Amino acid sequence: MSDEKSKATLLKEEIMMKGSKGAATLNAEEIKKADDFCVGYKKFLDHSPVEREAVSYTLELAKKAGFTEYDENASYNAGDKVYYVNRDKAIALAVIGKNGVKNGARLAIAHIDSPRIDLKPNPLYEDTNLALFKTHYYGGLKKYQWTALPLSLHGTVVKLDGTKVNITWGDDENESCFCVTDLLPHLAKDQVSKPLAKVFTGEDLNVLVGSRPYEDGNDEKDLVKLNVMAILNKKYGIVEGDFLSAELCLIPSFKTRDIGFDASMIGGYGHDDKVCAYPAVMASLDVETPEQTCVTYLTDKEETGSDGNTGMQSDFLRYFIYDLAKQDGIDGYKALSKSTCLSADVSAAYDPTYASAYEAKNSCYINEGVVISKYTGHGGKYDTSDASAEYMGKVRALLEKNNVMWQVGELGKVDMGGGGTIAKYVANMNVDVVDLGVPVLCMHAPFEIVSKIDVYMAYRAFFAFFDDKI
């Protein structure tokens, strides 16, 4: 048999895509780098379950790396590193480039909020000798996934005198936690006959927080509620009225864990979108003197539409770029118009158990690198930014040049559902933008799963974006 390749084989090698670039193509050294990188990521995830804590932890990392607080009246030089915090719930990290923002900035934008259960403004009540919290769920979650689950309380309370109190209760395995109760199967005939979306309503997500009455209560009412409030008062110095000026939420109380016999994956709460936030932050910390100013921005409120003054629809980032442009002697809108952005957000990894929800040829897969999504939205490409072919080509070439493992993918089958990212709000500022992130299994569940290799490739992608010329 001849060893010469046929014309068809040669043509195929020249013009056809090569297929998967999965984990099998990486050597042991690269896999170890991925595993080592994820040690820091797992710590970040455990310390950053809610946006205020994510900002605090990011700020700690940034200061250790030499970042200083941004001063609009200061003069900055290439290589200077600054941070800019928005109301303790969003943060920008900027590394000043050799050309500043004269030719635009490089933006990597991730969000640090995740689906959770928020407390209502007046949450604490007692019913049949049980103390409970009334809640209002946040973001697109499946309510049934949050029942019969150990929960922790996180957040901030501002007292009447203006004192700010940070609360964390339930993370330590030796500390008590909280729970949304569920109905036993023996009495669930009516419950299980309902459509899944109607099994639990928002008003059913009441959180059990106590059952013992306050001692020496005599004939007073609501002694269990009083006892809970007395415990909170003793530990934090707060009174019931302080709930009215508080941001408190309940999140899963379990820690991040490796998944699989091979420990190749990570399970935990809040991968969406901290699995993109952390690699982008680390890229900012590691880049030294880029050509263009590089900005990693961690924003809030993405899960509920990016509204509010800490969400992507606020003008905080726009004004920051304007201030940087002012120092360079150009108009802010011109700097933005020349900027490029990676919208650092996750996508839904193909799950063979639920294959009917995906279109296999245009899905992303675990262990095949970062995923580029040209558009998200729903139906006929509604509510999305659709990245241009030109910008897709530039990002594709950048990743290939820097040997970053990558893939493309859509969010499931057309008309199956859909979702959105902050990309459309960035595009509205006349910035070229495309979504680039990590594939996730069990997205929006209390326990999401990602690949360590994909997390590391996200870091490689963001670093290349900051450090290389496009």
Regions found by a protein language model. Give the residues of each.
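N-terminal hydrophobic/helix-forming segments and targeting peptides
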Residues: 1-470
